[in-house]
């Protein structure tokens, strides 16, 4: 008779990378991704915003991590019945694109770009920015992430740019924009200002050593409050930016700070009293002197002589003022003011009528206003300035100052602070509203809401949105070129531009947009012209415009946008609280008075195994494609998304991929092993599994109950955006499925009779694999697909199982069935997956098992049985007693033993003991010990921790209703745990996980027990020989054992047992198919086996 195989031949050592490539081809050939969207037409939608990356570099592990998270929730919401569009997007404009183009073209700086030609430069940017688009698609596809590349949006597309113009004009009309000359973080390497939040991206602060200099400024008049008289009065100021001293226009002191008048020769030095000791050497002090003290308020209004003559006639300058930003700490208590290079400096000087000076050009070099430093980069000028101060007699001290200093996020060069003209969004006008709207957002981790993001919103500042660069959406602002006839025009659409300028606008980029000019309508002479300002948008404004920009709102898709805003979900790494998340929030609040998204995950960063940032230069990470080809992408997905990185913490990943291999071994393989077991034995028996939940077998009921619990836990976890818990639920289920259900059901699968009990076992295992394949399909999309397809290798789902009618014949009552008698158990035959004809697991509906009722009593009891068995096996391991060695007994000591007696045979068989003994005198074997949760209790009672610890060790506590009394305090349930500990003289003991029961293994070995252990060893040796000989699991064999060790007694007593377990018969004088040599108690044994 032909053996019909209903399932594919599955190898236990699968090539998972090859398997994944087959699945990817299946998806592509059958257009599964598009089907998953089309099948949900008419259903409610799950709105997902895909943050646009730059395509001028290859994706790294951070991109893959974000992509995995995006894919999990998009797939999950799809099988939950939602329509989930996944349109990819590209960030195309801004510094990243320009810097890459400059590198490729071999040019650097604004002047070089202008000489090269803006049109040619931007054309190169346009081509360069999508350089790695195909590589991105390869990586994203290989990681099993489904996105729509064909309809991707690009921030450089005309439609997207027009929506950005609309947003700008809307803000302008609302009075939320203004133009100003203000001091900002400035990248001299990129020749552009940066927003304050850009200095907070990617840990842009670096430790830097600068030369700090203390300088003496000569007062123009004596300080009248002193009792003595001096030839000269000098006030000391300290700065870490000597290069700003040529631009000094004022000094600031603290009104309430004490200042000491320190005499040296005929000069009186004025310095904050708290700093005098720091300058003892320079001022010739012994430390015993007493000085006259005055308040800073007494210094206000005094004039001093300029350090240099560059701006000595600058109006209203060179006075001492009070500044509330001057506090005690570093320095001298005196701050030098250069309003062109400091925010506080500018604000204070502006209030005193002092106009700023800024003798530094766009590239960070001094201009001709400082002739002896002209053309010198500011940081390179420090030494020359210090030398000049020494020559003039104004220098007092130079020291090395190490501090965290902001660097450019693109070039990693140190920033300067510099006054530049810019357009600003009045974020401070509506920041309180942003704080309110933030309360509508669910943040993961939760603390981001009120801390990382919330605090940032509370301290939000006006946002500089203009950049004096080339490749970007141009600011739609035209100004009159004649200040006599001022006029500003702001445009919010192409239609408005075409109407006013009378030309067809086909490209909004520079230089084409710059060529649009027209006569100034407000100039009666007709001589002045309206010309566009040169600035382009900060690229963060464009990425923040993504929700409406991708839809070309409000010019098209108005209803679509309103239905798709805000997003249900977005995810990026935590620094985007200062980046994309923030700009989305600013623009959404200002334009729509709504939060831009409702759920947001802030994941952590991936570092190398030593905690360093992943870097091509350091060569400290493997190419992700290499890992995919070696272990598969599902393994990398699990590695990342089951870790704390999804909770905002760091993930250290090794270059060699050991972590991913461990995931493959510990997570993926157990899933595959269960599937392999099913297909192997089902094919051997020519049986088909059916989707059926009606078996009364206690192991079947237990594993199906555990299945539903796992399915519910996965659903609950993913509903709460918690992949970590979801993966744990999958792993925990397959641990029980493999190491308990399948192991305890082996006899049912192995027996030759194809009875109802055997069919029930196959149905139950099939139902578990089928259901979990769907439930975990978002978490491991490719192995789930492989299992799902394999289970449907030769047929559609079982119609009977789905119809709700059962054709399963009831088993006769057994001892195991009695274990669930009297316990409410609703027989179920259906799984809630109505789309039973789906060709892909990702086209199914999430399983609910609504017609199957969990047997909680059975689960609790069986979990206790597992606890007993796992503890017993651990004790065996500790005592070096192999599992095949029988033991006399196990004692279970508990007040509640009745529910375990029905499982006595199972316990005896699993842990290999002859008897189970029950006791209830727990107090004779163990006692409760108090374990304190120090982090939790320490928050509430830090002052009593020492006393509580001492009392807990002495046993001076009492369990009371609702808690535990100790040291006059009542501890809450999450602040302590009572642990059951066996007395030290009790051997072979362990407490249950619930700390209410104890087990004790009898570890004494009698000769009879040892003999039986040898018999079991022989069985294992024969089974291994069968496997090594590549025999089928159904092959019957002949066995011959040749040994220097006398085995006759063992064979006489246990021969039948050995033959039954190995499908063998003892024989002699045959030609073996396979021979092996093994050791039994240091004696050599030769095994010969042959198919019979």
Curated annotation (Swiss-Prot):
Keyword vocabulary terms for this entry: Aminoacyl-tRNA synthetase, ATP-binding, Cytoplasm, Ligase, Metal-binding, Nucleotide-binding, Protein biosynthesis, Zinc
Single GO MF annotation: ATP binding
PROSITE patterns: AA_TRNA_LIGASE_I
Gene Ontology CC annotations of this record: cytoplasm
Superkingdom of the source species: Bacteria
Catalytic activity annotation: tRNA(Ile) + L-isoleucine + ATP = L-isoleucyl-tRNA(Ile) + AMP + diphosphate
UniProt xrefs under SUPFAM superfamilies: Anticodon-binding domain of a subclass of class I aminoacyl-tRNA synthetases, Nucleotidylyl transferase, ValRS/IleRS/LeuRS editing domain
Subcellular localization, as worded in the UniProt entry: Cytoplasm
Named cofactor requirement(s): Zn(2+)
Biological-process GO terms, alphabetical: isoleucyl-tRNA aminoacylation
InterPro entries in the cross-refs: aa-tRNA-synth_I_CS, aa-tRNA-synth_Ia, Anticodon_Ile_ABEc, Ile-tRNA-ligase, Ile-tRNA-ligase_type2, M/V/L/I-tRNA-synth_anticd-bd, Rossmann-like_a/b/a_fold, tRNAsynth_Ia_anticodon-bd
Known EC number: 6.1.1.5
Residue ranges of coiled coil: none
Binding positions for ATP per the UniProt entry: 616
Family: Belongs to the class-I aminoacyl-tRNA synthetase family. IleS type 2 subfamily.
Entry-linked PANTHER family: ISOLEUCINE--TRNA LIGASE, CYTOPLASMIC, SOLEUCYL-TRNA SYNTHETASE
HAMAP family reported in the protein's UniProt record: Ile_tRNA_synth_type2
Record's subunit section: Monomer.
Database matches in NCBIfam families: ileS (TIGR00392)
Protein name listed in UniProt: Isoleucine--tRNA ligase
Naturally occurring in which organism (per UniProt): Rickettsia conorii (strain ATCC VR-613 / Malish 7)
Name of the gene encoding the protein in the UniProt record: ileS
């Amino acid at each position: 008779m032909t053996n019909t195989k209903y399932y594919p031949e599955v190898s236990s050592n699968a090539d998972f990378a090859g398997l994944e490539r087959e699945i990817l081809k299946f998806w592509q050939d059958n257009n599964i991704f598009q089907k998953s969207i089309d099948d949900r037409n008419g259903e409610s939608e799950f709105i997902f915003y895909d943050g646009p990356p730059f395509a001028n570099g290859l994706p790294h592990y951070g991109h893959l991590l974000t992509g995995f998270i995006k894919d999990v929730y998009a797939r999950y919401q799809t099988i939950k019945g939602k329509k989930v569009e996944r349109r990819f997007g590209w960030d195309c404009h801004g510094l990243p694109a320009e810097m890459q183009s400059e590198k490729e073209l071999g040019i650097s700086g604004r002047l070089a770009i202008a000489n090269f030609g803006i049109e040619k430069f931007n054309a190169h940017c346009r081509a360069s920015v999508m350089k790695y688009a195909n590589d991105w698609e390869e990586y994203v596809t290989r990681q099993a992430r489904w996105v729509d590349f064909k309809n991707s949006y690009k921030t450089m597309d005309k439609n997207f740019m027009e929506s950005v113009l609309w947003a700008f004009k809307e803000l302008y009309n609302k009075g939320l924009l203004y133009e100003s000359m203000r001091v900002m973080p400035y990248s001299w390497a990129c020749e552009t200002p940066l927003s304050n939040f850009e200095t907070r991206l990617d840990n842009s602060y670096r430790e830097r050593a600068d030369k700090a200099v203390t300088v003496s400024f000569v007062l123009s008049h004596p300080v009248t409050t002193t009792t003595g008289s001096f030839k000269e009065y000098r006030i000391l100021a300290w700065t870490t930016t000597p290069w700003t001293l040529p631009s000094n226009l004022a000094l600031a002191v603290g009104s309430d700070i004490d200042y000491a008048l320190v005499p040296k020769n005929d000069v009186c030095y004025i310095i904050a009293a708290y700093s005098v000791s720091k300058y003892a050497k320079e001022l010739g002090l012994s430390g015993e002197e007493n000085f006259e003290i005055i308040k800073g308020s007494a210094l206000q209004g005094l004039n001093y002589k300029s350090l240099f003559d560059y701006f000595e006639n600058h109006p209203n300058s060179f006075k001492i003022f009070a500044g509330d930003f001057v506090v005690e700490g570093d320095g001298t208590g005196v701050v030098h003011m250069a309003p062109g290079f400091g925010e506080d400096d500018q604000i204070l000087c502006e209030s005193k009528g002092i106009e700023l000076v800024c003798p530094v050009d766009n590239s960070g070099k001094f201009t001709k206003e400082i002739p002896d430093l002209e053309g010198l980069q500011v940081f390179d000028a420090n030494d020359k300035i210090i030398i000049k101060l020494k020559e003039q007699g104004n220098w007092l001290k130079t020291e090395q100052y190490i501090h965290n200093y902001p660097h450019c996020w693109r070039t990693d060069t140190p920033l300067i602070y510099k006054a530049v003209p810019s357009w600003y969004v009045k974020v401070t006008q509506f920041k309180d509203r942003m704080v309110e709207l933030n309360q509508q957002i669910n943040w993961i981790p939760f603390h981001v809401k009120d801390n990382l993001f919330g605090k940032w919103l509370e301290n939000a500042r006006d946002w500089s949105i203009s950049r004096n660069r080339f490749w970007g959406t141009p600011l739609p602002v035209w100004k009159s070129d004649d200040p006599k006839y001022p006029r500003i025009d702001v445009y919010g659409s192409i239609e408005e531009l075409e109407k006013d300028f009378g030309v067809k606008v086909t490209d909004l980029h520079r230089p084409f947009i710059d060529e649009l000019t027209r006569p100034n309508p407000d100039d009666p002479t007709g001589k002045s012209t309206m010309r566009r300002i040169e600035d382009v948008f900060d690229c963060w404004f464009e990425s923040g415009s993504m929700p409406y920009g991708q839809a070309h709102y409000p010019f098209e898709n108005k209803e679509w946008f309103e239905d798709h805003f805000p997003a249900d979900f977005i995810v990026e790494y935590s620094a985007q609280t200062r980046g994309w998340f923030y700009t989305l929030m600013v623009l959404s609040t200002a334009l729509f008075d709504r939060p831009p998204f409702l759920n947001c995950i802030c994941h952590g960063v991936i570092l190398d195994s030593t905690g360093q940032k992943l870097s091509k230069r350091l060569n400290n990470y493997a190419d992700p494609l290499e890992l995919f080809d070696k272990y598969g992408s599902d393994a990398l997905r699990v590695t990342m998304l089951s870790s704390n990185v999804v909770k905002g913490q760091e993930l250290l990943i090794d270059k060699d991929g050991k972590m991913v291999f461990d995931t493959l071994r510990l997570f993926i393989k157990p899933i595959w092993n269960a599937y392999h077991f099913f297909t192997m034995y089902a094919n051997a028996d020519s049986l088909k599994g059916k989707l059926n939940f009606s078996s009364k077998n206690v192991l079947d009921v237990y594993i199906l109950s555990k299945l539903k619990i796992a399915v519910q836990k996965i659903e609950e976890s993913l509903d709460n955006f918690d992949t970590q818990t979801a993966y744990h639920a999958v792993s925990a289920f397959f641990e029980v499925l493999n190491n308990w259900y399948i192991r305890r059901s082996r006899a049912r699968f192995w027996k030759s009779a194809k009875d109802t009990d055997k069919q029930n076992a196959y149905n139950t295992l099939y139902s578990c694999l089928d259901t979990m394949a769907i439930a975990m399909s978002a978490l491991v999309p490719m192995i789930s697909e492989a299992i799902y397809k394999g289970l449907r290798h030769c047929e559609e789902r079982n119609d009977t199982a789905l119809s709700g009618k059962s054709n399963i014949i009831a088993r006769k009552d057994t001892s195991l069935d009695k274990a669930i008698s009297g316990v409410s158990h609703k027989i179920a035959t259906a799984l809630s997956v109505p789309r039973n004809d789906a060709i892909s697991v990702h086209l199914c509906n999430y399983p609910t098992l609504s017609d199957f009722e969990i047997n909680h009593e059975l689960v609790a009891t069986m979990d206790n049985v597992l606890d007993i068995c796992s503890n017993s096996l651990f004790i065996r391991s500790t005592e070096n007693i192999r599992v095949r060695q029988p033991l006399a007994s196990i004692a279970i000591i508990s007040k509640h033993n009745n529910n375990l007696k029905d499982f006595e045979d199972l316990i005896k068989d699993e842990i290999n003991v002859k008897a189970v003994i029950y006791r209830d005198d727990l107090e004779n074997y163990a006692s409760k010990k108090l374990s304190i949760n120090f982090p939790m209790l320490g928050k509430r009672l830090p002052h009593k921790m020492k006393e509580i610890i001492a009392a807990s060790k002495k046993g001076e506590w009492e369990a009371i209703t609702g808690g535990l009394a100790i040291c006059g305090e009542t501890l809450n349930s999450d602040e302590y745990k009572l642990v059951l500990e066996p007395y030290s003289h009790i051997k072979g003991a362990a407490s249950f996980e619930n700390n209410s029961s104890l087990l004790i293994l009898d570890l004494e070995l009698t000769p009879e027990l040892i003999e039986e252990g040898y018999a079991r060893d022989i069985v294992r040796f024969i089974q291994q020989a069968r496997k090594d000989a590549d025999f089928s699991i159904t092959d019957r064999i002949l066995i011959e054992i040749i040994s220097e060790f006398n085995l006759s007694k063992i064979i006489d007593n246990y021969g039948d047992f050995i033959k039954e377990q190995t499908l063998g018969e003892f024989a002699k004088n045959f030609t073996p198919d396979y021979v092996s040599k093994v050791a039994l108690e240091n004696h050599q044994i030769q095994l010969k086996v042959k198919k019979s």
